[in-house]
């Protein structure tokens, strides 16, 4: 997925057998590997209410995702589907409907089914870029990936391809 979206994903089926947390996971290495793979389209929808922002992302079955680092604890709801997700250092299988409070930090998940996942953040801000500045921290790997994608897109002369 390219752009200002929160979630990165690529097609790959992990081995969920046994204790997948036996070896420490290096998030930076995982993210760098994920960004080198073909990206999966994960649509994001923005919902606003009085004092609340809700960010809904759609994850296709078979995709792996890694979210940006959240600066604060926040509410999450799995609206549809089934995910294997890292919660409090353990892989949990969650199935919709499922609500929990996510601690500050990053989420890693594997979509076992087509899924719809929502982060809920307390804010009156309605500018998504400003909301991201307030609530998430993007890694250097992602910022470099995003910059390179924008550079490649801007270098394409569409008139040549028409």
Give the predicted meaning of each segment.
Residues 112-162:
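Double-stranded beta-helix
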Residues 55, 66, 85-86, 102, ...:
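Short hydrophobic/aromatic-rich beta-strand segments that constitute the beta-sheet cores
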Residues 70-89:
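Glycine- and acidic-residue-biased ligand/ion/polar-headgroup-sensing regions
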Residues 53-70:
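Conserved short histidine dyad/triad with adjacent acidic residue
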Residues 75, 82, 106-108, 114-116:
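Structural motif
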Residues 1-56, 88, 145-162:
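A short, N-terminal "cap"/entry segment at the start of jelly-roll beta-barrel domains
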Residues 84-108:
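Short acidic-glycine-tyrosine-enriched beta hairpin
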